[in-house]
Amino acid sequence: MGSLSDSTPLMKDVQGIRKAQKADGTATVMAIGTAHPPHIISQDSYADFYFRVTNSEHKVELKKKFDRICKKTMIGKRYFNFDEEFLKKYPNITSFDKPSLNDRHDICIPGVPALGAEAAVKAIEEWGRPKSEITHLVFCTSGGVDMPSADFQCAKLLGLRTNVNKYCIYMQGCYAGGTVMRYAKDLAENNRGARVLMVCAELTIIALRGPNDSHIDNAIGNSLFGDGAAALIVGSDPIIGVEKPMFEIVCAKQTVIPNSEEVIHLHLRESGLMFYMTKDSAATISNNIEACLVDVFKSVGMTPPEDWNSLFWIPHPGGRAILDQVEAKLKLRPEKFSATRTVLWDYGNMISACVLYILDEMRRKSAAEGLETYGEGLEWGVLLGFGPGMTIETILLHSLPPV
Protein backbone atom coordinates (compact mmCIF):
# COMPACT_ATOMS: atom_id res chain seq x y z
CA MET A 1 0.00 0.00 0.00
CA GLY A 2 1.41 3.39 -0.94
CA SER A 3 1.72 6.24 1.55
CA LEU A 4 -0.60 9.23 1.49
CA SER A 5 0.93 12.39 0.07
CA ASP A 6 -0.22 15.97 0.20
CA SER A 7 -1.55 15.58 -3.34
CA THR A 8 -4.07 12.85 -2.51
CA PRO A 9 -7.75 13.85 -2.32
CA LEU A 10 -7.97 12.54 1.26
CA MET A 11 -5.08 14.66 2.47
CA LYS A 12 -6.49 17.72 0.73
CA ASP A 13 -9.79 17.11 2.52
CA VAL A 14 -8.03 16.88 5.88
CA GLN A 15 -6.13 20.09 5.19
CA GLY A 16 -9.36 21.81 4.24
CA ILE A 17 -11.05 20.60 7.39
CA ARG A 18 -8.15 21.79 9.49
CA LYS A 19 -8.19 25.22 7.87
CA ALA A 20 -11.93 25.53 8.39
CA GLN A 21 -11.55 24.64 12.07
CA LYS A 22 -9.23 27.56 12.80
CA ALA A 23 -10.35 31.10 13.53
CA ASP A 24 -9.24 33.87 11.20
CA GLY A 25 -8.22 36.37 13.87
CA THR A 26 -6.41 36.71 17.17
CA ALA A 27 -8.08 35.82 20.46
CA THR A 28 -9.62 38.83 22.21
CA VAL A 29 -10.91 39.61 25.69
CA MET A 30 -14.57 40.47 25.21
CA ALA A 31 -15.92 40.78 28.75
CA ILE A 32 -14.75 40.71 32.37
CA GLY A 33 -16.63 39.96 35.59
CA THR A 34 -15.45 39.87 39.21
CA ALA A 35 -16.88 38.72 42.54
CA HIS A 36 -15.77 38.53 46.15
CA PRO A 37 -17.23 37.24 49.44
CA PRO A 38 -19.02 39.64 51.82
CA HIS A 39 -16.70 39.72 54.84
CA ILE A 40 -14.19 42.60 54.89
CA ILE A 41 -11.22 42.77 57.25
CA SER A 42 -9.00 45.84 57.24
CA GLN A 43 -5.28 45.21 57.20
CA ASP A 44 -4.77 47.50 60.21
CA SER A 45 -6.97 45.22 62.33
CA TYR A 46 -5.98 41.89 60.78
CA ALA A 47 -3.30 40.99 63.35
CA ASP A 48 -5.84 41.44 66.16
CA PHE A 49 -8.40 39.36 64.28
CA TYR A 50 -5.93 36.64 63.32
CA PHE A 51 -4.41 36.12 66.76
CA ARG A 52 -7.85 36.26 68.39
CA VAL A 53 -9.53 33.65 66.16
CA THR A 54 -6.52 31.33 66.43
CA ASN A 55 -6.40 31.63 70.25
CA SER A 56 -2.84 32.91 70.01
CA GLU A 57 -3.03 36.25 71.82
CA HIS A 58 -0.60 34.96 74.43
CA LYS A 59 2.11 35.02 71.72
CA VAL A 60 2.70 38.73 72.26
CA GLU A 61 6.04 39.12 70.48
CA LEU A 62 4.96 37.03 67.50
CA LYS A 63 1.82 39.14 67.18
CA LYS A 64 3.90 42.33 67.14
CA LYS A 65 6.08 40.86 64.40
CA PHE A 66 3.03 39.78 62.39
CA ASP A 67 1.45 43.22 62.76
CA ARG A 68 4.63 44.80 61.36
CA ILE A 69 4.50 42.38 58.42
CA CYS A 70 0.86 43.32 57.73
CA LYS A 71 1.59 47.04 57.82
CA LYS A 72 4.36 46.67 55.22
CA THR A 73 2.21 44.84 52.66
CA MET A 74 0.60 47.94 51.08
CA ILE A 75 -2.77 46.22 51.50
CA GLY A 76 -5.71 48.21 52.85
CA LYS A 77 -8.33 45.50 53.18
CA ARG A 78 -9.21 42.00 52.07
CA TYR A 79 -12.39 40.01 51.49
CA PHE A 80 -13.01 36.55 52.96
CA ASN A 81 -15.71 33.89 52.96
CA PHE A 82 -15.35 33.58 56.75
CA ASP A 83 -15.75 35.77 59.80
CA GLU A 84 -15.00 35.19 63.48
CA GLU A 85 -18.28 33.42 64.23
CA PHE A 86 -17.79 31.06 61.31
CA LEU A 87 -14.25 30.13 62.36
CA LYS A 88 -15.34 29.33 65.92
CA LYS A 89 -16.94 26.18 64.48
CA TYR A 90 -13.59 25.00 63.12
CA PRO A 91 -10.89 25.06 65.84
CA ASN A 92 -8.92 22.48 63.87
CA ILE A 93 -8.60 24.93 60.96
CA THR A 94 -7.39 27.78 63.17
CA SER A 95 -4.78 25.57 64.84
CA PHE A 96 -1.35 25.35 63.23
CA ASP A 97 -1.23 21.71 62.21
CA LYS A 98 -4.27 19.72 63.38
CA PRO A 99 -5.90 17.48 60.74
CA SER A 100 -8.44 19.72 59.03
CA LEU A 101 -8.44 18.93 55.31
CA ASN A 102 -11.92 17.39 55.37
CA ASP A 103 -13.42 20.54 56.89
CA ARG A 104 -11.50 22.79 54.52
CA HIS A 105 -12.73 20.80 51.55
CA ASP A 106 -16.31 20.81 52.85
CA ILE A 107 -16.11 24.62 52.70
CA CYS A 108 -14.16 25.01 49.45
CA ILE A 109 -15.74 22.33 47.25
CA PRO A 110 -19.14 24.11 47.06
CA GLY A 111 -17.76 27.60 47.75
CA VAL A 112 -15.16 27.88 44.99
CA PRO A 113 -17.43 27.09 42.00
CA ALA A 114 -20.20 29.21 43.51
CA LEU A 115 -17.95 32.26 43.76
CA GLY A 116 -16.60 31.57 40.28
CA ALA A 117 -20.13 31.32 38.90
CA GLU A 118 -20.97 34.69 40.45
CA ALA A 119 -18.11 36.32 38.53
CA ALA A 120 -19.03 34.40 35.37
CA VAL A 121 -22.62 35.67 35.45
CA LYS A 122 -21.31 39.25 35.41
CA ALA A 123 -18.97 38.51 32.51
CA ILE A 124 -21.76 36.85 30.52
CA GLU A 125 -24.09 39.80 31.17
CA GLU A 126 -21.45 42.25 29.95
CA TRP A 127 -20.74 40.09 26.90
CA GLY A 128 -24.41 40.37 25.95
CA ARG A 129 -24.85 37.03 24.17
CA PRO A 130 -26.72 33.91 25.35
CA LYS A 131 -24.78 31.58 27.64
CA SER A 132 -25.68 28.79 25.22
CA GLU A 133 -23.08 30.32 22.88
CA ILE A 134 -20.25 29.46 25.30
CA THR A 135 -18.32 26.55 23.78
CA HIS A 136 -15.49 26.10 26.29
CA LEU A 137 -15.06 26.55 30.04
CA VAL A 138 -11.63 26.76 31.70
CA PHE A 139 -11.82 26.82 35.50
CA CYS A 140 -8.83 27.44 37.77
CA THR A 141 -8.41 27.27 41.55
CA SER A 142 -5.95 26.36 44.27
CA GLY A 143 -8.83 26.04 46.73
CA GLY A 144 -9.13 22.27 47.09
CA VAL A 145 -9.62 19.33 44.72
CA ASP A 146 -12.63 17.14 44.05
CA MET A 147 -14.39 14.97 41.44
CA PRO A 148 -16.52 15.91 39.59
CA SER A 149 -14.22 18.90 39.52
CA ALA A 150 -14.88 22.61 39.93
CA ASP A 151 -15.38 23.16 36.19
CA PHE A 152 -18.24 20.65 36.23
CA GLN A 153 -19.84 22.28 39.27
CA CYS A 154 -19.50 25.79 37.82
CA ALA A 155 -21.02 24.72 34.49
CA LYS A 156 -23.91 23.13 36.40
CA LEU A 157 -24.52 26.27 38.46
CA LEU A 158 -24.48 28.44 35.33
CA GLY A 159 -26.71 26.11 33.34
CA LEU A 160 -24.23 25.83 30.48
CA ARG A 161 -25.05 23.40 27.71
CA THR A 162 -24.13 19.78 28.43
CA ASN A 163 -21.62 19.53 25.58
CA VAL A 164 -19.52 22.52 26.64
CA ASN A 165 -15.83 21.57 26.51
CA LYS A 166 -14.52 21.81 30.08
CA TYR A 167 -11.00 22.13 31.48
CA CYS A 168 -9.97 22.32 35.13
CA ILE A 169 -6.65 23.65 36.39
CA TYR A 170 -5.90 22.82 40.02
CA MET A 171 -3.08 23.91 42.34
CA GLN A 172 -1.02 26.18 40.09
CA GLY A 173 -0.89 29.12 42.47
CA CYS A 174 -0.26 32.77 41.71
CA TYR A 175 0.87 32.51 38.09
CA ALA A 176 -2.29 30.69 37.02
CA GLY A 177 -4.25 33.74 35.85
CA GLY A 178 -1.75 33.94 33.00
CA THR A 179 -1.95 30.19 32.45
CA VAL A 180 -5.70 30.28 31.96
CA MET A 181 -5.38 33.16 29.51
CA ARG A 182 -2.83 31.12 27.55
CA TYR A 183 -5.27 28.18 27.42
CA ALA A 184 -8.12 30.47 26.36
CA LYS A 185 -6.04 31.96 23.54
CA ASP A 186 -5.19 28.53 22.12
CA LEU A 187 -8.78 27.32 22.36
CA ALA A 188 -10.27 30.45 20.78
CA GLU A 189 -7.82 30.56 17.87
CA ASN A 190 -7.95 26.84 17.07
CA ASN A 191 -11.73 26.42 17.19
CA ARG A 192 -13.63 28.67 14.79
CA GLY A 193 -16.49 30.43 16.52
CA ALA A 194 -15.36 29.35 19.99
CA ARG A 195 -16.33 31.49 22.96
CA VAL A 196 -14.25 30.56 25.98
CA LEU A 197 -15.43 31.32 29.51
CA MET A 198 -12.34 31.38 31.73
CA VAL A 199 -12.87 31.50 35.49
CA CYS A 200 -10.38 31.87 38.34
CA ALA A 201 -11.79 31.49 41.87
CA GLU A 202 -9.90 31.33 45.15
CA LEU A 203 -10.82 30.74 48.81
CA THR A 204 -7.86 31.09 51.13
CA ILE A 205 -9.37 29.02 53.93
CA ILE A 206 -7.61 26.07 52.27
CA ALA A 207 -4.38 27.52 53.75
CA LEU A 208 -5.52 29.49 56.81
CA ARG A 209 -3.83 28.31 60.02
CA GLY A 210 -2.67 29.62 63.36
CA PRO A 211 0.76 31.23 63.82
CA ASN A 212 3.88 29.27 64.69
CA ASP A 213 7.13 30.79 65.95
CA SER A 214 9.26 28.53 63.75
CA HIS A 215 7.19 28.85 60.57
CA ILE A 216 6.95 32.52 59.63
CA ASP A 217 6.29 31.58 55.97
CA ASN A 218 2.65 30.75 56.66
CA ALA A 219 2.23 33.96 58.63
CA ILE A 220 3.46 35.90 55.59
CA GLY A 221 0.92 34.07 53.43
CA ASN A 222 -1.84 34.91 55.91
CA SER A 223 -0.85 38.58 55.68
CA LEU A 224 -1.18 38.65 51.88
CA PHE A 225 -3.90 36.40 50.49
CA GLY A 226 -7.56 37.27 50.02
CA ASP A 227 -10.62 35.64 48.47
CA GLY A 228 -11.98 36.53 45.06
CA ALA A 229 -13.04 35.32 41.62
CA ALA A 230 -12.79 36.73 38.12
CA ALA A 231 -14.11 35.58 34.75
CA LEU A 232 -13.37 36.52 31.14
CA ILE A 233 -15.08 35.79 27.84
CA VAL A 234 -12.40 35.17 25.21
CA GLY A 235 -12.98 34.65 21.49
CA SER A 236 -11.62 35.38 18.03
CA ASP A 237 -13.38 37.14 15.14
CA PRO A 238 -15.77 39.27 17.25
CA ILE A 239 -19.22 39.96 15.84
CA ILE A 240 -19.22 43.61 14.81
CA GLY A 241 -21.82 45.65 16.67
CA VAL A 242 -22.54 42.84 19.12
CA GLU A 243 -19.27 41.94 20.84
CA LYS A 244 -16.90 44.59 22.17
CA PRO A 245 -13.28 43.36 22.31
CA MET A 246 -10.92 45.19 24.66
CA PHE A 247 -7.58 43.42 24.35
CA GLU A 248 -6.05 41.12 21.75
CA ILE A 249 -4.02 38.25 23.25
CA VAL A 250 -1.11 38.37 20.82
CA CYS A 251 1.31 35.93 22.44
CA ALA A 252 1.40 33.83 25.62
CA LYS A 253 4.51 32.09 26.92
CA GLN A 254 5.49 30.27 30.10
CA THR A 255 9.01 30.17 31.54
CA VAL A 256 10.36 28.12 34.44
CA ILE A 257 13.37 29.69 36.15
CA PRO A 258 15.99 26.93 36.57
CA ASN A 259 16.91 25.74 40.07
CA SER A 260 14.26 27.88 41.76
CA GLU A 261 11.57 25.44 42.84
CA GLU A 262 12.46 25.85 46.52
CA VAL A 263 11.91 29.62 46.43
CA ILE A 264 8.12 29.27 46.73
CA HIS A 265 6.43 25.92 47.20
CA LEU A 266 3.18 24.72 48.75
CA HIS A 267 2.06 21.27 49.87
CA LEU A 268 -1.46 19.98 50.52
CA ARG A 269 -1.42 18.09 53.82
CA GLU A 270 -3.95 16.75 56.32
CA SER A 271 -3.59 20.13 58.04
CA GLY A 272 -4.38 22.08 54.85
CA LEU A 273 -2.21 23.84 52.29
CA MET A 274 1.24 24.60 53.75
CA PHE A 275 3.07 27.64 52.37
CA TYR A 276 6.85 27.94 52.12
CA MET A 277 8.72 30.97 50.80
CA THR A 278 12.30 32.19 50.95
CA LYS A 279 13.48 35.79 50.95
CA ASP A 280 14.81 35.23 47.41
CA SER A 281 11.43 35.34 45.63
CA ALA A 282 11.51 39.01 44.60
CA ALA A 283 15.12 38.87 43.40
CA THR A 284 14.54 35.61 41.51
CA ILE A 285 11.66 37.15 39.56
CA SER A 286 13.24 40.55 38.95
CA ASN A 287 16.52 39.02 37.76
CA ASN A 288 14.72 36.95 35.11
CA ILE A 289 11.84 39.17 34.04
CA GLU A 290 13.59 41.07 31.25
CA ALA A 291 14.62 37.86 29.46
CA CYS A 292 10.97 36.74 29.49
CA LEU A 293 9.84 40.06 28.05
CA VAL A 294 12.44 40.03 25.29
CA ASP A 295 11.49 36.46 24.42
CA VAL A 296 7.78 37.18 24.03
CA PHE A 297 8.43 40.14 21.70
CA LYS A 298 10.98 38.31 19.58
CA SER A 299 8.74 35.25 19.27
CA VAL A 300 6.24 37.32 17.26
CA GLY A 301 8.91 39.11 15.21
CA MET A 302 8.78 42.38 17.15
CA THR A 303 11.73 44.35 18.46
CA PRO A 304 11.48 44.79 22.25
CA PRO A 305 10.99 48.45 23.20
CA GLU A 306 14.04 50.41 24.30
CA ASP A 307 12.01 51.92 27.13
CA TRP A 308 9.69 49.56 29.01
CA ASN A 309 7.64 52.60 30.07
CA SER A 310 6.14 52.62 26.57
CA LEU A 311 3.96 49.64 27.58
CA PHE A 312 1.00 49.24 29.93
CA TRP A 313 1.62 46.77 32.76
CA ILE A 314 -0.51 44.12 34.47
CA PRO A 315 1.87 42.23 36.79
CA HIS A 316 0.61 39.84 39.44
CA PRO A 317 1.08 41.52 42.85
CA GLY A 318 2.88 38.67 44.58
CA GLY A 319 3.81 41.18 47.24
CA ARG A 320 5.21 44.65 47.69
CA ALA A 321 8.84 43.51 47.39
CA ILE A 322 8.22 41.76 44.06
CA LEU A 323 6.56 44.84 42.57
CA ASP A 324 9.26 47.17 43.89
CA GLN A 325 12.13 45.07 42.55
CA VAL A 326 10.58 44.43 39.12
CA GLU A 327 9.79 48.13 38.84
CA ALA A 328 13.40 49.01 39.69
CA LYS A 329 14.92 46.38 37.39
CA LEU A 330 12.94 47.62 34.37
CA LYS A 331 13.37 51.31 35.28
CA LEU A 332 9.62 51.83 35.29
CA ARG A 333 7.94 55.01 36.46
CA PRO A 334 5.85 54.52 39.63
CA GLU A 335 2.56 55.06 37.82
CA LYS A 336 3.15 52.07 35.51
CA PHE A 337 2.05 49.68 38.28
CA SER A 338 -0.84 51.90 39.36
CA ALA A 339 -3.60 49.41 38.49
CA THR A 340 -1.78 46.56 40.21
CA ARG A 341 -1.10 48.53 43.37
CA THR A 342 -4.74 49.67 43.47
CA VAL A 343 -5.99 46.09 43.35
CA LEU A 344 -3.42 44.97 45.92
CA TRP A 345 -4.57 47.73 48.27
CA ASP A 346 -8.28 47.03 47.78
CA TYR A 347 -8.25 43.21 47.75
CA GLY A 348 -4.85 41.76 48.66
CA ASN A 349 -3.31 38.92 46.67
CA MET A 350 -6.17 36.83 45.25
CA ILE A 351 -3.84 34.26 43.72
CA SER A 352 -4.98 33.30 40.18
CA ALA A 353 -7.82 35.85 40.05
CA CYS A 354 -5.61 38.84 40.78
CA VAL A 355 -4.29 39.71 37.30
CA LEU A 356 -7.83 39.53 35.93
CA TYR A 357 -8.98 42.03 38.57
CA ILE A 358 -6.10 44.27 37.47
CA LEU A 359 -7.14 43.93 33.82
CA ASP A 360 -10.63 45.00 34.87
CA GLU A 361 -9.32 47.92 36.93
CA MET A 362 -7.22 49.17 34.01
CA ARG A 363 -9.92 48.97 31.37
CA ARG A 364 -12.52 50.66 33.61
CA LYS A 365 -10.22 53.52 34.58
CA SER A 366 -9.03 53.99 30.98
CA ALA A 367 -12.62 54.18 29.71
CA ALA A 368 -13.69 56.52 32.52
CA GLU A 369 -10.81 58.89 31.71
CA GLY A 370 -11.65 58.88 28.00
CA LEU A 371 -8.29 57.45 26.96
CA GLU A 372 -7.71 56.19 23.43
CA THR A 373 -7.35 52.53 24.44
CA TYR A 374 -8.32 50.28 27.34
CA GLY A 375 -4.60 49.97 28.11
CA GLU A 376 -4.12 53.41 29.67
CA GLY A 377 -4.18 54.95 26.19
CA LEU A 378 -1.29 52.77 25.03
CA GLU A 379 -1.33 50.20 22.26
CA TRP A 380 0.90 47.45 23.67
CA GLY A 381 1.29 45.94 27.11
CA VAL A 382 2.07 42.82 29.10
CA LEU A 383 0.28 40.71 31.69
CA LEU A 384 2.58 38.78 34.02
CA GLY A 385 1.97 35.85 36.33
CA PHE A 386 4.49 34.84 39.01
CA GLY A 387 4.30 31.69 41.11
CA PRO A 388 5.70 28.38 42.32
CA GLY A 389 8.33 26.73 40.19
CA MET A 390 9.43 29.56 39.95
CA THR A 391 7.17 30.07 36.98
CA ILE A 392 6.54 33.23 34.95
CA GLU A 393 3.63 33.61 32.53
CA THR A 394 4.23 36.41 30.00
CA ILE A 395 1.22 37.56 27.96
CA LEU A 396 1.66 40.14 25.20
CA LEU A 397 -1.51 42.21 24.81
CA HIS A 398 -2.62 44.67 22.14
CA SER A 399 -5.16 47.13 23.49
CA LEU A 400 -8.15 48.32 21.48
CA PRO A 401 -10.09 51.62 21.64
CA PRO A 402 -13.26 51.80 23.76
CA VAL A 403 -16.52 51.48 21.85
From Swiss-Prot:
Marked site: Determines the polyketide chain length and product specificity: 207
Gene3D superfamilies: 3.40.47.10
Top-rank taxon: Eukaryota
Effect of residue 207 to M: Turns into a pentaketide synthase
Matching InterPro entries: Chalcone/stilbene_synt_C (IPR012328), Chalcone/stilbene_synt_N (IPR001099), Polyketide_synthase_type-III (IPR011141), Thiolase-like (IPR016039)
pH behavior: Optimum pH is 6.0.
Keyword Acyltransferase: yes
Active site: 174
Pfam families listed in its UniProt record: Chal_sti_synt_C, Chal_sti_synt_N
GO biological process terms, semicolon-separated: flavonoid biosynthetic process; polyketide biosynthetic process
Function statement: Catalyzes the iterative condensations of 6, 7 or 8 molecules of malonyl-CoA to produce various aromatic polyketides. Produces the heptaketide aloesone, the aglycone of aloesin, from 7 molecules of malonyl-CoA as a major product. Also able to produce a hexaketide pyrone, a heptaketide 6-(2-acetyl-3,5-dihydroxybenzyl)-4-hydroxy-2-pyrone, a novel heptaketide 6-(2-(2,4-dihydroxy-6-methylphenyl)-2-oxoethyl)-4-hydroxy-2-pyrone and octaketides SEK4/SEK4b.
Family: Belongs to the thiolase-like superfamily. Chalcone/stilbene synthases family.
Self-association and partners: Homodimer.
Protein name: Aloesone synthase
Taxonomic source organism: Aloe arborescens
Phylogenetic lineage: Eukaryota, Viridiplantae, Streptophyta, Embryophyta, Tracheophyta
